[in-house]
Design a protein with these regions (language model features):
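Conserved, mostly hydrophobic/aromatic
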Residues: 39, 47, 83, 140, ...
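Short glycine/proline- and charge-enriched loop/turn segments
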Residues: 62-63, 105-109, 220-227
Length: 257
């Protein structure tokens, strides 16, 4: 097998987070484009993971960051243009907030999260509409820590935005209520219907990350893989094949590598 990499999570993402939207100038855009083109030249098959809204979760430790930027940030719009130009997708992390809301009082969240979360649904759709040639992969479908990303909202967004794709994250161990799987690892009917209605828009995503500082690392554990196998086994064969590998091969142009 082969390993093909995305890039920009440690550089483009940092440049976006460090730039106030109303302070982005031509020099900032030039430096951002230069870095993005270096990533493409190095062989990346995607830009990302780029954090638009990233909650800090206790399970990931106290160092797990809270990150926020408006999805219609000028550098994100520029990245969409570059992604369309270079014909590679953008992988985005967006914990969805349809309208301003209080952070739910749940033990899952670290204290570094703000008490009030800003709406980002409308600005996310502005990013999607900015350049329809940009393939945008919204990460972690099937995991919903805020309870704001149920199948009906995703169905509406997929219908309105033909350049929107999603990667599934089904996690390990017994899934909580906000997962696409129930506690018996049965794929919820609302999720199965969504996948069947949009068979070319979903891929598998394990959400495992690796850094050069942290020493030996491993991929997804057996519990996580078991969840994916269980979900795929409950789908029609052609749908399972598309989600397991066919869609990723097309969206990320893996056959061209």
């Amino acid at each position: 097998g082969r390993i093909l990499l995305g890039g920009g999570g440690g550089s483009l993402n940092a440049m976006i987070q460090a730039s106030a939207p109303d302070q982005v100038g031509d020099d900032d855009k030039k430096a951002f484009r230069k870095r993005a083109e270096e990533i493409v030249a190095a062989g990346a098959v995607a830009f990302g993971e780029i954090a638009l809204h990233h909650l800090s979760l206790r399970l990931m430790g106290p160092q797990h960051p809270y990150e926020w930027t408006p999805p219609d940030h000028p550098l994100l719009l520029l990245l969409a243009d570059i992604a369309a130009e270079k014909n590679i997708p953008m992988d985005l992390h967006l914990d969805l907030v349809p309208e301003d809301m209080n952070l739910p009082d749940r033990p899952a969240f670290n204290s570094t999260n703000p008490a009030v979360l800003k709406a980002n649904l409308a600005t996310f759709e502005r990013l999607l509409a900015h350049n329809r040639g940009a393939r945008i992969v919204w990460a972690h479908a099937g995991t919903d820590p805020l309870g704001t990303r149920p199948p009906p909202i995703q169905r509406e967004l997929l219908t309105r935005n033909p350049n929107l794709f999603m990667s599934l994250r089904l996690g390990g161990n017994a899934p909580p209520p906000v997962f696409a799987l129930d506690t018996d690892k049965k794929l919820k009917l609302s999720w199965l219907a969504l996948l069947r209605d949009y068979p070319d828009r979903f891929v598998i995503g394990t959400d495992y990350f690796h850094t050069v500082q942290s020493g030996p690392q491993r991929g997804p554990g057996e519990e996580t893989l078991a969840n994916y196998r269980a979900a795929l086994a409950q789908m029609p064969p052609e749908l399972a094949k598309a989600i397991a590998h066919g869609n990723a091969e097309r969206i990320y142009r893996l056959g061209d590598q």
